[in-house]
């Protein structure tokens, strides 16, 4: 199964009185070039100044082959399409860690109150101007809670996509994790990772 746009409870949500438009306090960084990793990080921190392209490029150049978690997925120098190694190192500069989620586990055991946000890597359609090409490429997106609700802050979206509460979020995550080539990172404070308190079953 390939990853396709989330539809889940969208129809139900659209017919309800729950808000669909993004409240003004949500920071949603839009896609520029191949900088989806940068956008996902800034959207997680809800801060346009959390990271810059230059910051991520410095981190990438600092990482040696011996420290690469997945050396076969290295970013091409300077193109901005950074891999998980750069994301993990960038988070560590802010006192956070990325927990790579084992897709065999039930997302129901995630202690959501201890997770700041989620970064997902999933296939996304390529576009040439207004044209959508019949090709897919891996893409980083951010999902996080703002104002008591969870939102998909994919930088390719025109505006944040409302997901809903905790149960809707878990459905969203399950749906995408069933797909091929979809991965999930939990963004948590260092102390949460150290004590594994992102798990509700410990």
Curated annotation (Swiss-Prot):
The annotated region (Disordered) lies at 1-22
* Enzyme class, UniProt record, top EC level: hydrolase
> Which compartments does it reside in?
Cell membrane; Cytoplasm
Josephin domain sequence ranges:
23-202
Q: Name one GO biological process term.
A: protein deubiquitination
Tissue-level expression: Widely expressed (at protein level).
Q: Which residues carry the post-translational modification Phosphoserine, per the record?
A: 15
- Where is it chiefly localized? membrane
The record's catalysed reaction(s) read: Thiol-dependent hydrolysis of ester, thioester, amide, peptide and isopeptide bonds formed by the C-terminal Gly of ubiquitin (a 76-residue protein attached to proteins as an intracellular targeting signal)
| Function description | Deubiquitinates monoubiquitinated probes (in vitro). When ubiquitinated, cleaves 'Lys-63'-linked and 'Lys-48'-linked poly-ubiquitin chains (in vitro), hence may act as a deubiquitinating enzyme. May increase macropinocytosis and suppress clathrin- and caveolae-mediated endocytosis. May enhance membrane dynamics and cell motility independently of its catalytic activity.
The record's note on quaternary structure and interaction partners says: Interacts with beta-actin/ACTB.
Q: What is this protein's record name?
A: Josephin-1
């Amino acid at each position: 199964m390939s990853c396709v746009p989330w539809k889940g409870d969208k129809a139900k949500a659209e017919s309800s009185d729950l808000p669909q438009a993004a409240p003004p306090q949500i920071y949603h960084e839009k896609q520029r070039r191949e900088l989806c990793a940068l956008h996902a990080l800034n959207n997680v921190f809800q801060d346009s100044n959390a990271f810059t392209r230059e910051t991520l490029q410095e981190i990438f150049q600092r990482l040696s082959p011996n420290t690469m978690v997945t050396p076969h997925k290295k970013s091409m120098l300077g193109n901005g399409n950074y891999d998980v190694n750069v994301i993990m190192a960038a988070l560590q500069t802010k006192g956070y860690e990325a927990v790579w989620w084992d897709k065999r586990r039930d997302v129901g055991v995630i202690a959501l109150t201890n997770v700041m946000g989620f970064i997902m890597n999933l296939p996304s359609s390529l576009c040439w101007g207004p044209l959508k090409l019949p090709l897919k490429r891996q893409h980083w997106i951010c999902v996080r809670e703002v104002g008591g609700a969870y939102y998909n802050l994919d930088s390719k979206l025109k505006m944040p996509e409302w997901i809903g509460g905790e149960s809707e979020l878990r459905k969203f995550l399950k749906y995408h994790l069933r797909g091929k080539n979809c991965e999930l990172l939990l963004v948590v404070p260092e102390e949460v990772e150290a004590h594994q308190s992102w798990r509700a079953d410990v």
